[in-house]
């Protein structure tokens, strides 16, 4: 089957909605066990990792994380691949911005490394075509049989978009290494029907009065902060949709109401609870569409928050109210009555920052040390600042007060991801 036919087949096969959890479980069960049989027979690492555990008991498989995967990548893959050659090609592509070289039918790319170490993703033409069909089903503003011009603002181009493009669907790549004012002129000339970009790019286009009228806007590759979502939505007069993707897979996408739902038609997402009462968890991903680089019982460091109640769109796929960030984004402040540290999740920091002044347009918050938090604000001359949000937070969490250092916030969209809240200080050192 050609790439384009496979993309169309996957588009048509992707359920628009699931009516019940029972339907989702039936859909997943057969596909997961079939996939695990394939992986066990073709991956030396997983065959050893699962030794003594039956395929049907896959929920008992030991977890995998990025470190374990990267340390065992050659034996984890289900295809023979010269990793040194693959890495050379991927590194060269990032420098030359020519992403066409591959190893056979395999494309190789690096993650952005926001978690501290860079991962690698390896996909075949078949997987890429399947992925494209799935994402078109979840993201197009209309039918695949209509005319579309999809603009993609990416840190690295993909070999696959050109292959699945057609007379009806055109893909345009906008390289984030270029200056943003140049990219804005280019996208205005293109005037795409669908715009997929990091929220920092969407925010830049909104702030600079970009003259385009897309039917659908999709935020991807960065956490969409409420302050950015509001401004982007108001400027373009529409719901800001989201693709929540990572090196480990396409984890969630929004429904027509703009609510994130886990992509449970292509993966099972288990939960390692951080705070079950409030719905915070680390996702444990079993992707039954990834064959070359299998992702099975893979624990992510991201923090997701379950949406309370059932989404009004009627889709039974698990709804997510927020992608809160990574474990690296959790602040740790010393308790008043001991030498132990209290974790403070990003949402609490965000709320305290937003109470500083109602005129805040953009911000960042970085924990620099055990006792210091840097807060960047835009505009930079806001006055007065109300610190009561932080004072209440320190009191409620029973932690020692941290020094709040106010600086100017400045971020120009580029290949570096925007992270509004994160921790530079290692509380374990």
Model-derived regions, located:
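Short, well-ordered coil loops that connect the C-terminus of an alpha-helix to the N-terminus
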Residues: 117, 237-238, 246, 359, ...
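General small-molecule cofactor/ligand-binding pocket signal
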Residues: 172-175, 241-243, 270, 402-407
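Nucleotide 5′-phosphate-binding alpha/beta core
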Residues: 1-110, 116-130, 137-141, 156, ...
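Active-site phosphate/ATP/adenylate-binding loop shared across adenylate-forming ligases
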Residues: 1-15, 71-218, 223-235, 259, ...
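Conserved AMP-binding/adenylate-forming
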Residues: 230-311
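AMP-binding/adenylate-forming catalytic core of the ANL superfamily
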Residues: 195, 292, 298-398
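Short acidic, glycine/serine/threonine-rich loops at helix termini
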Residues: 162-165, 253-256, 417
């Amino acid at each position: 089957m050609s790439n384009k036919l496979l993309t169309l087949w996957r588009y048509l096969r992707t359920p628009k909605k699931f009516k019940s959890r029972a339907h989702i479980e039936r859909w997943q069960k057969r596909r997961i066990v079939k996939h695990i049989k394939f992986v066990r027979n073709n991956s030396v690492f997983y065959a050893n990792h699962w030794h003594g555990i039956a395929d049907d008991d896959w929920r008992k498989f030991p977890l995998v994380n990025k470190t374990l995967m990267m340390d065992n990548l050659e034996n984890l893959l289900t295809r023979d691949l010269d990793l040194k050659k693959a890495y050379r090609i991927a590194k060269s592509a990032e420098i030359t911005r020519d992403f066409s070289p591959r190893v056979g039918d395999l494309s190789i790319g690096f993650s952005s490394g926001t978690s501290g170490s860079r991962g690698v993703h390896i996909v075949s033409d078949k997987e890429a075509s399947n992925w494209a069909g799935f994402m078109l089903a979840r993201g197009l503003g209309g039918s695949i049989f209509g005319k579309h011009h999809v603009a993609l603002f990416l840190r690295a181009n993909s070999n696959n978009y050109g292959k699945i493009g057609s007379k009806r669907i055109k893909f345009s790549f906008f390289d984030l290494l270029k200056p943003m004012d140049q990219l804005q002129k280019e996208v205005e000339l293109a005037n795409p029907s669908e715009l997929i970009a990091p929220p920092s790019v969407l925010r830049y286009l909104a702030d600079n009065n970009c003259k385009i009228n897309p039917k659908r806007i999709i935020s991807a590759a960065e956490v969409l902060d409420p302050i950015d979502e509001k401004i982007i939505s108001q400027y373009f007069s529409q719901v800001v949709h989201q693709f929540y993707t990572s090196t480990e897979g396409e984890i969630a996408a929004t429904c027509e109401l703009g609510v994130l739902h886990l992509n449970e038609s292509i993966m099972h997402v288990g939960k390692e609870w951080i705070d079950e009462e409030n719905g915070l968890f680390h996702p444990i991903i079993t992707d039954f569409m990834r064959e070359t680089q299998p992702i099975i019982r893979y624990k992510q460091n991201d923090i997701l928050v379950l949406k309370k109640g059932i989404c009004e769109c009627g889709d039974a796929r698990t709804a997510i109210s927020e992608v809160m960030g990574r474990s690296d984004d959790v602040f740790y402040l010393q308790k008043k009555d001991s030498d132990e540290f209290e974790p403070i999740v990003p949402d609490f920091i965000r709320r305290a920052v937003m109470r500083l002044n109602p005129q805040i347009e953009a911000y960042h918050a970085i924990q620099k040390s055990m006792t210091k938090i840097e807060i960047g604000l835009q505009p930079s001359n806001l006055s007065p600042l109300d610190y009561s949000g932080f004072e209440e937070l320190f009191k409620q969490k029973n932690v020692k007060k941290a020094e709040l250092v106010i600086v100017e916030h400045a971020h120009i969209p580029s290949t570096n991801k925007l992270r509004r809240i994160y921790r530079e200080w290692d509380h374990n050192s």
